[in-house]
Amino acid sequence: MLEKINADIVSAMKEHDTLKLSTLRLLKGAVDLERINKRVDKLNDDNIIAIIAKQIKTRKESIVEFERGNRQDLIDKTNSEIEILSAYMPEQISEEELSNIIEQAIKEVNATTIKDMGSVMKIVSSKVKGRADMQQVSSIIKNKLN
């Protein structure tokens, strides 16, 4: 995955695509920082996907602030950055499939109350790893357990 990011940085430089270039450089910086913090030579794809998801999440939070400040230019730029980063994420799971996985997990642990949410989340997160927004997963589980 890191090789693909590096190759895309080179192609963005050749195409003079400044937005893509800056977004990918920020991503590469975040990956390098995480690699240094973990004291490893190379991160695996799961770690890189987690970093990308974190980058997307922070940009979505920024959009909320930009909307409050009526900054359409920054909203558009940030949405474009999210699109660039999303290209590196695994294909997102459909709501129907996610709902089925949650139902199976609830049955698996015999969850009946909201107190069982942690054990359900543990099972679901291992199955959907990086393919679903965990806030969405959490809200669906809450609805099903209430």
Residue ranges: model-predicted function:
Residues Q135:
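Key DNA-contact positions within bacterial/archaeal DNA-binding proteins
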